[in-house]
Amino acid sequence: MTHSLKPWNTFGIDHCAKHIACAENEQQILSAWQQATREGLPVMILGEGSNVLFLENYAGTVILNRLKGIEVNETADAWHLHVGAGENWHQLVRYALDNNMPGLENLALIPGCVGSSPIQNIGAYGVELQRVCDYVDCVELETGKRLRLSAAECRFGYRDSIFKNEYQDRVAIVAVGLRLSKQWQPVLTYGDLTRLDPKTVTAQQVFDAVCHMRTTKLPDPKVNGNAGSFFKNPVVAADIAMELLERFPNAPHYPQADGSVKLAAGWLIDQCQLKGVTIGGAAVHRQQALVLINANDATSKDVVALAHHVRQKVGEKFNVWLEPEVRFIGRSGEVNAVESIA
């Protein structure tokens, strides 16, 4: 007996898992994990499946994290939110804004659950989760012990954290603590946001602009399956960036604090005339080259082949090698996504 994973991944790829368990509290997560472990099965915890690509049938148990609840504590200088890992991220952004607690608006419409946000250190339009994260509560799967990691202990990086490294497969995230400062400062460094006046802009205007940019450029997973940005924006050494800018002076680039330079993967892909290119049922989105879509009953092999093609074309033209942001899941767990498309 197997269960289809199609409803549980936004790519809409039709693979199966041996078991699927829905967990509404910590105990249910632990019970499902212990049961799978006793049976010698692999086990993974999934939010809304908006950042994964299942490469094949999963041989174990998929636990759907559905822990809910939002608590707010106000202090003199900030609002402190304690949010269940299974809450929808965008609904949280709206909730905060509706209750006059700004600070999350640049992160509007990022798909997925709150519990997934620290794993990737989600980010968009100049803001990353680490800017507002206070702590992450998790439970050790083997012992059932509760842990609270401060933001510093989460070791956030660009689309990276301790949860993708030492703590991968060892803990389940049960809640995230956010600190939204009452001294709100808009971040208007990207896209249409640069046109807004920092002196008069409201959080609602930032939210509206972000939603407009995302809905006009990004495909709706309900129409064309996708996992949002498929590739990370590459971060390269300054000398490589200089070399590239000598050849392509109009290439978007964002100097980083450590001297490296972040490039725009979407622009690099676009320069290779790859928008609309298809392999099997998978396609490069026509509006946003960074997004690969399930255009016509794509298989995971189609998506991997297309990602490989994109990576090769960009690498040959720019000598910059893209890495997937999407996590690749094999038969018994996560596999190296770069190796899968190299």
From Swiss-Prot:
Superkingdom to which the source organism belongs: Bacteria
Record bears the keyword Cytoplasm: yes
Pathway assigned to this chain's UniProt record: Cell wall biogenesis; peptidoglycan biosynthesis
Predominant place of localization: cytoplasm
EC supergroup of this enzyme: oxidoreductase
Catalytic residues of the enzyme: R159, S229, E325
Location in or out of the cell: Cytoplasm
One of the GO BP terms on file: cell wall organization
Cofactor: FAD
Catalysed conversion reaction: UDP-N-acetyl-alpha-D-muramate + NADP(+) = UDP-N-acetyl-3-O-(1-carboxyvinyl)-alpha-D-glucosamine + NADPH + H(+)
Gene3D superfamilies linked to this entry: 3.30.465.10, UDP-N-acetylenolpyruvoylglucosamine reductase, C-terminal domain (3.90.78.10), Uridine Diphospho-n-acetylenolpyruvylglucosamine Reductase, domain 2 (3.30.43.10)
DNA repair listed as a keyword: no
FAD-binding PCMH-type domain residues: 13-183
Gene Ontology CC terms: cytosol
One GO MF term: UDP-N-acetylmuramate dehydrogenase activity
Alphabetically ordered keywords of this record: Cell cycle, Cell division, Cell shape, Cell wall biogenesis/degradation, Cytoplasm, FAD, Flavoprotein, NADP, Oxidoreductase, Peptidoglycan synthesis
EC number: 1.3.1.98
Pfam families: FAD_binding_4, MurB_C
InterPro entries with a match to the protein in the record: FAD-bd_PCMH (IPR016166), FAD-bd_PCMH-like_sf (IPR036318), FAD-bd_PCMH_sub1 (IPR016167), FAD-bd_PCMH_sub2 (IPR016169), MurB (IPR003170), MurB_C (IPR011601), MurB_C_sf (IPR036635), Oxid_FAD_bind_N (IPR006094)
Family: Belongs to the MurB family.
HAMAP family in the record: MurB (MF_00037)
Summary of the function given for this chain in its UniProt record: Cell wall formation.
Name the UniProt record assigns to this protein: UDP-N-acetylenolpyruvoylglucosamine reductase
